[in-house]
Amino acid sequence: MTWALRRLVLAPAVVASAVLLWFTLPLWLLGAALVSPVVPGRLRVVRLAWVAVLYLTIEALLLVVLLGMWLASGFGRRIRTPYWEGIHYDLVQGVMWIFFREARRVLRLTITTDGPAPDAHPGVPIVVCCRHAGPGDSFTLVHALMHWYGREPRVVLKDTLAWDPAIDVLLNRIPARFITPGRPGEDVDKQIAALATGLDENDAFVIFPEGGNFTPQRRTRAIERLRRLGLQAMADRAERMTHVLAPKPGGLLAALDAAPEADVVLVAHTGLDHLTGVADIWRALPMDKRLTMRWWQVPRAEIPTDRDARIDWLYGWWETIDAWVAENRPEDLPPGRSR
């Protein structure tokens, strides 16, 4: 029923909304231009309006293109072959390139990377563990992996993202998993292991061990959860980390077991992580910010084989990430200040 609602109701509604938007676009732009002078921030409303137009337009075009691919692949019979999988990855990369080009141009967002060069992992599959904080960090990571590192990411996502029609259709045609943490009878670690199986030399398995975007409230709940489980030592270590959530090791351990040839790449980022709500994002627009990503490569030979040792190793790296974030804090904009 949920699948039918997303595919047969929501997806056509998005396409129809995009068509209606373009027919009425002059009115929307005129309204945005009239409101913009009384709203703090240079052309803030106009910029946001353009981002909304761009998003809805690309969403609708993607759905049309994906329908065409389904027809061209024999009504979906060949849609999961390597040929069509490669075309879908090219489509993802193209869409990410457009979005981030517009983010640079319209929102004045720049992205810098620090760490191993793109050719630091030649011919080796990688498992990528990333800090989860700030708006759109998963898309930024996918863009970086595809655009700069030439990788085809396999991503684990929360099932709520499947309500975006284009994401729903597209990621169900390439190696990815929508998971529902806590759902009875759903073995998340088993799904993660299945997705991480069979990585080749240009694949990157992507996982966010924290399980959710960082907020102070989630950090407190994660520490309390460890204490309820009797994991006092882990809770104490998590309490000393102030910029990250306590990592949940199960998914990463399952991925490491399923991909015994893979190196591990850990990723921290800062710049937008302090934007934890709609009000924060609104105050920061137009962004005029620099998002910095720090990458570390860990060769497989340096990763412990024992489960408890791996958990300790993961916590040690999360402490490194926490320290890096503390040293690279973004400068918050005062509320109401224009940029």
Predicted ranges, named:
Residues M1-V127:
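Membrane-proximal helical "anchor" segments flanking the first transmembrane region
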Residues V14, I98, K190, P247-G250:
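Short, conserved clusters of charged catalytic residues that mark active-site
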Residues L67-I98, R104-V106, H121-P122, I126-P184:
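Catalytic core of membrane glycerolipid acyltransferases/transacylases, capturing the structured
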Residues T112-D114, R177, W296:
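General small-molecule cofactor/ligand-binding pocket signal
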Residues H121, L199-D200:
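Extracellular/periplasmic catalytic domains that process cell-envelope and extracellular macromolecules
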Residues R151, D159-I174, D200-D306:
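A cross-family acyltransferase "interaction/gating" segment
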Residues E186-T197:
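A Trp-anchored, charged/polar loop motif used as the substrate-binding/catalytic surface
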Residues P304-R339:
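Accessory terminal regions of nucleic-acid processing enzymes
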